[in-house]
Regions:
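Short, small/hydrophobic-residue-rich motifs at membrane-helix boundaries and re-entrant hairpins
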Residues: 15, 19, 68, 77-78
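Alpha-helical segments flanking ligand/cofactor-binding loops in enzyme cores
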Residues: 64, 112-113, 159-160
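Paired acidic/hydrophobic, glycine-rich loop segments that form the ligand-binding mouth/hinge
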Residues: 55, 70-77, 168-173
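A conserved helix-loop-strand patch within extracytoplasmic ligand-binding domains
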Residues: 78-81, 87-145
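Extracytoplasmic loops/domains of multi-pass membrane proteins
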Residues: 65-67, 81, 309
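Small-molecule-sensing regulatory modules
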Residues: 1-38, 43-44, 51, 134-345
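Short, structured active-site "lid" loops
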Residues: 46-73
Length: 345
């Protein structure tokens, strides 16, 4: 077996993910070399993600290295990986998912419910911003809204900005905070009923060249089937809504057992950018009706998971989310036009 060249971003969190992946593959008896690749998102740390334009600001250069044969395997934070398949590449597996929840981090307040009107709340996510504005509107209908500000940089940088007083609180992913050893900074978890998490949050994704059977054969050994089916459902939902990584869309799927039956459950919602309107849906897909039934082949389960996601998206559209999808697409087109316009003299 050849040495597997594993591509990753150079950030501390990405290196944690790559090191974990390398160690897991080494336990299978493989030789692995980590290759650091700087992406657009890394080189433009001070710009808001929504202003960087195209999808894949944290993945495009890594995928390019895969296609060029410079690496054999890429490890992504799955929430950063565009849902549209890249020609010549294949998403082949996800290991067991970490905590999917968002956390509230503050030096002054115990929970997001304690934030007063006008408080400065930092997040890099349009989804979190929309949900925070919705939550604030419900809590303080007659008071000034929170000042929800963009915050860029790695986890350590964001925590320093909080400690320096630039923000009263920030929202981060529990998985990243914990992986880097800062789990004790979380003051409380955000409830899924108000802050449904991002598609793929807490999960890693392994991507290879689709014709690299040798690498695929080894990497799929790291696949955690419940996680894999869950993220396939979530990504199918996002793909049908054409939302992209920055859209105010939340989704959380999980494989559950109920009285011997095996099911995939999916909660999903889409919001306007200002959080004033939202649509939600909950749905189930049966994988096995009872414990005595023959287990379905993985390929069939994958198809059912993706069908669940696309059907949930159709439900949201039927409920009235078409206008929000159009708003998202319009906003994306306007950003693309601004970025492609020649600089003014």
């Amino acid at each position: 077996m050849k040495t597997i060249r594993l591509g990753t971003r150079p950030s501390a969190l990405a290196m944690w993910q790559a090191t974990w992946t390398r160690d897991a593959l080494v336990k299978l008896g493989l030789d692995v070399e980590i290759v650091k690749i700087t992406t657009t998102g890394d080189s433009k740390r001070h710009e808001a993600i929504v202003n960087l334009g195209a999808q894949g600001v944290f993945t495009k250069e890594i995928q390019g290295a895969l296609l060029a044969g410079e690496i054999d395997l890429a490890v992504h934070s799955l929430k950063d990986l565009p849902v549209e398949k890249a020609p010549g590449l294949k998403l082949v597996a996800s290991p067991k998912r970490a905590d999917t929840r968002d956390v509230f981090v503050s030096n002054r307040y115990e929970s997001i419910a304690d934030l007063p009107p006008g408080a400065r709340l930092g997040t890099s996510s349009m989804r979190r911003k929309s949900m925070a504005l919705r939550y604030c509107r419900k809590r303080f209908p007659d008071e000034p809204a929170w000042d929800v500000r963009d915050i860029r940089g790695n986890v350590e940088t964001r925590l320093k900005k909080l400690d320096d007083g630039e923000y009263d609180a920030i929202i981060l992913a529990s998985a990243g905070l914990t992986r880097l050893g800062f789990g004790d900074r979380a003051r409380s978890f955000l409830d899924d009923s108000e802050f449904l998490t991002s598609v793929g949050q807490g999960a890693l994704g392994f991507e290879t060249r689709e014709d690299d059977a040798e690498t695929i054969e080894q990497v799929v050994k790291l696949r955690h089937e419940p996680t894999w089916l869950s993220v396939l459902a979530e990504r199918a939902l996002l793909r049908r809504l054409e939302g992209g990584c920055i859209a105010p869309i939340g989704a959380r799927a999980s494989v559950v057992s109920v009285e011997g039956a095996e099911l995939i459950s999916l909660n999903a919602e889409i919001l306007t950018f200002d959080g004033a309107k939202d649509y939600r849906t909950q749905s189930l897909q049966v994988l096995r009706a009872n414990a005595n039934d023959r287990e379905l082949p993985l390929e069939t389960k994958e198809q059912l998971a993706e069908l669940l996601g696309s059907n949930a998206a159709e439900t949201l559209l039927d409920l009235g989310a078409t206008g929000i999808v159009a708003e998202i697409q319009k906003s994306r087109a306007e950003r693309a036009a601004r970025l492609s316009a020649p600089p003014q003299k």
